Amino acid sequence: MKKRFLSVIVLSAALFSVQAQEGKGGISPEMLGQIKQSYQGTAADKALRNAIGNNDIRKLALNQENMQGMDTHFSIKVESKGITDQKSSGRCWLFTGLNVMRAKTLAEYGFQSFEFSEVYPFFWDQLEKANLFLQGIIDTSKSPLTDKTVEWLFQHPLSDGGTFTGVADIVSKYGLVPKDAMPETNSSENTSRMANLISLKLKEYGLQLRDMAAAGAKPEALEKEKTTMLGTIYRMLVLNLGVPPTEFDYVRHDAKGNPVETEHHTPMSFLEKYGDKQLLTNYVMLMNDPSREYYKCYEIDYDRHRYDGKNWTYVNLPVEEIKEMAIASLKDSTMMYFSCDVGKFLNSERGLLDVKNYDYESLMGTTFGMDKKQRIQTFSSGSSHAMTLMAVDLNKDEIGRAHV
């Protein structure tokens, strides 16, 4: 019986192999001949091949017609002082959200310089995300490992990326501290190694929690074990980022940089005085996604920073209306949290983001014709980097260029 079964399997595999070879859909010799004709090997083809084979494609595609001088005048601008630097980390969302608040603080108090600690909220963000993962594992413990939600959790146990919703959720719960109270570390400026180690530990813990649940552990036991696990994650975060302060002294300076007063604060009292305590109610997230219906609110489950926080939630609007709101926000002296697909057409040497920066079509001898809707539908484009929109230049009431 066993030999017969094996013979059937072998025969079926052989038949499938023959059908695959003889069936339509593969590249036949005739088709390959037609395909090869697309490269003629002309002098122009050879020159392009030599150039592309020995150079960075991006440099060759740099559009010289778009290299004229840049006009740095902006008709509407929110003033700020200094530049904050996320270094080699994915904390753009956090720096951007804090910069929106920082501009208001600089304007209100007339400080020469001022910066919130980005490490402080990032510490709590990572701990909260670890809890989000572990609790998500507990919630889905009855589902198989092949379940889509379970797969997503194990694929995304921890990230240093985020959205403005995360800024609001973390800051409203833990408060803020000045830069000096919790300064940058090597791990905060270069997050990948720390994130990889914590993610590896979380995945290990996730499997342990699933095993406990499968063995019949009660919710109280799972909660207790999760708390112990988070203790290990907390220690790892302290080793990498430092101990978050619970109270501190802050020396306030006047507009000339002279010390005026030493204030004693907790993170929540510092938020109360120098930050925006209405982050959860004063702001909404807007999105332009032409692949989905406009004038509707969308929510992405588990894409949040706290288990008890708010999912990434946004109102989908035509881009023209979002531009109008951006102008209104800047006219109201409020910078705007802004994100888009940055990497493809950013000329970092000039500090210019323009779809005309690189002419890949002329270089490759073909067109890239998908519109925004099609690029989103095919996962070819998406929001990749958050920035603070601080100025625009208007041309007949429309945005001609922007400063971020």
What are these regions (language model features)?
Residues 69, 105-136:
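Active-site-surrounding "flap" and adjacent substrate/cofactor-binding loops of secreted or lumenal enzymes
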Residues 22-82:
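N-terminal regions that are enriched for targeting/export leaders
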Residues 1-23:
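Bacterial Sec-dependent N-terminal signal peptides
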Residues 82, 87, 96-99, 120-127, ...:
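Short, flexible loop/turn elements at secondary-structure junctions
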Residues 82, 91, 118-120, 335-337, ...:
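Beta-sheet entry/capping signal
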Residues 87-101, 158-165, 385-386:
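Active-site nucleophilic cysteine motif
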Residues 402-404:
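Conserved small/polar residues in nucleotide/adenosyl-binding loops
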Residues 127-393:
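Predominantly the structural core of cysteine protease catalytic domains
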